[in-house]
Regions:
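N-terminal catalytic cores of peptidoglycan-degrading enzymes
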Residues: 43-44, 194-294
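Catalytic glycan-binding domains that act on GlcNAc-containing polysaccharides
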Residues: 34-177
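Basic/polar, cationic surfaces and motifs that engage anionic cell-wall
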Residues: 5, 170-226, 237, 309-381
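Secretory targeting and sorting signals
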Residues: 1-34
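Structural recognition of the beta-strand scaffold that forms the well-ordered cores
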Residues: 64-69, 90-92, 243-248, 268-274, ...
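SH3-family beta-barrel domains
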Residues: 375-393, 403-407, 451-460
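SH3/SH3-like beta-barrel superfamily modules
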Residues: 403-451
């Protein structure tokens, strides 16, 4: 939804929360600085230390904490600004009628809400405290806490999802990330093969299970039907459909789906599209009016895209292509011209305070896809982490050093190739990215993405 910071809500939370007596020693940077030349295991950065400290203090596996943090935010606290569900920080501690994790974290840690919202280390501590409390409630203790698979029901509870299928969607994504491993924002976990103990969720049909009823309900044949609660949209239309609106969720895929099923949200969209693979969930029938753009609701269809406007790493080629297919299908069925006058960003509608999809959304590429072209994927935007990351003439550690990146930097990757292996913070990667503007190569290990190979980027 790409909204501006809603500090009035944070102020209300502060007024309602008891002031904490415990304080952590200062805010930690979102991106830790690794050594300039990684040839062995690097010392962990401050964010990595915060995860380890929280894990040790509350006996919650570090992999679980990092998996949740990456699923929620790609390990970015977004300067304490709220998500669409009023969640804060890289662990998405929330304050809404169905998700009390922020107030729980404040009570359990003694930390004030403002610190939990804005300080990444405090946010991680708060999440660990909540997870520890939930683990106690289900009797997860002793050596069983070392078994990552046993944490499944605890992670599902942490999601406070609207229903079982959405809770399973959320938790399966966390475990998928744990399986892939993470190397982002100075934090790394090695890939782990984990067999989740789904408990009561074992009998919950995963979101996307198709039935004759769900197939009949969707307007776009490739979509999964998972309806929003009826109090979050209006049945029917008062105007002809003429415009398709592109949104960014300012939150996770599972979290957005759950929020649209929450009666207190008073918002919805017709479609939600996942970053990792372009999965499409339809939540409101096109014949009905979703609540996503205020006065423009009656004549628009809304597409929400998982991610945050200030993090281009969420905008994968899989998501662009999947979304464009949905938009093209809608336009063709409804006779809507496939141009920018009729396919707009949220920010372009009247009387909006929202900024999505933001400057990182590639409109040129998207419209080419909508119009049925098959362009080469664009140069992909990613963010590096750390200071002193070297760009070399070749993907080799003995390649000529062209320059060093001074700190977290947005880079434009044209392709990727295998080269020398680089090890940092216990993770090894032999994939290198070719940078458009710097004219050389950097190791993928210092690009903010959890897998060794960057998504959608072609091989050199």
């Amino acid at each position: 939804m790409g909204q501006t910071a809603r500090m009035t809500r944070l102020t209300a939370m502060l007024a309602a929360a008891a002031a904490g007596a415990i304080a952590l020693s200062g805010a930690l940077p979102t991106n830790a600085a690794p050594p300039p030349e990684p040839v062995g295991s690097a010392l962990p950065g401050d964010l990595a230390k915060a995860f380890q400290s929280a894990s040790t203090s509350y006996d919650v596996p570090r992999e679980v904490l990092v998996g949740i943090g990456y699923a929620e935010s790609h390990l970015d606290g977004h300067n304490g600004e709220p998500s669409q569900a009023n969640g804060y920080g890289l662990m998405h501690l929330a304050s809404n009628p169905t998700n009390p994790t922020m107030s729980e974290a404040s009570k359990l840690t003694g930390l004030p809400v403002e610190k939990l919202a804005k300080d990444s280390a405090a946010n991680i501590q708060g999440a660990a405290a909540v997870l520890d409390s939930y683990a106690d409630q289900v009797g997860l203790a002793g050596s069983a806490r070392k078994d990552l698979g046993k944490w499944y029901s605890v992670v599902a509870q942490y999601s406070h999802s609207a229903d079982g299928p959405t809770a399973r969607l959320y938790t399966d994504e966390v475990y998928r990330i744990i399986g892939l491993g993470v190397g982002a924002a100075g934090v790394s976990i090695d890939p782990k093969q984990v067999t989740p103990d789904r408990g009561k969720y074992a009998n919950v049909a995963p979101l996307g299970t198709r039935t004759p009823q769900s197939i009949a309900a969707v307007d776009y044949p490739g979509a999964i039907w998972n309806p929003a609660i009826s109090s979050n949209y209006r049945v029917g239309r008062t105007a002809a459909i003429s415009t398709i609106v592109i949104h960014v969720t300012q939150g996770s895929y599972a979290g957005t789906i759950s929020w649209f099923k929450n009666a207190s949200a008073k918002v919805s969209a017709h479609y939600v599209i996942r970053s990792s693979d372009g999965q499409v969930t339809q939540m409101v029938a096109e014949k009905d009016t979703a609540w996503h753009v205020g006065t423009a609701n009656p004549y628009t269809i809304g597409l929400e895209h998982e991610g945050f406007v200030d993090q281009p790493s969420w905008f994968t080629d899989a998501m662009y292509r999947s979304s464009a297919a949905v938009t093209r299908n809608i336009a063709d069925r409804r006779g809507i011209p496939k141009d920018r006058a009729h396919i707009k960003g949220h920010v372009e509608l009247p009387n909006q305070t929202h900024t999505d999809p933001g400057p990182n959304w590639n409109w040129t590429y998207y419209m080419q896809l909508v119009n049925g072209d098959n362009p080469n994927p664009p140069t992909y935007n990613f963010t590096t982490y750390g200071a002193g990351v070297r760009v070399r003439a070749t993907p080799r550690l003995n390649g000529t050093i062209l320059l060093e990146l001074p700190g977290p930097t947005q880079v434009f990757v044209t392709c990727q190739t295998q080269g020398d292996s680089v090890t940092a913070e216990g993770t090894t990667n032999n994939w290198w990215a070719k940078l458009r503007d710097q004219g050389g190569y950097m190791t993928n290990i210092y690009i903010d993405y959890p897998a060794a190979k960057l998504p959608g980027v072609p091989d050199c």
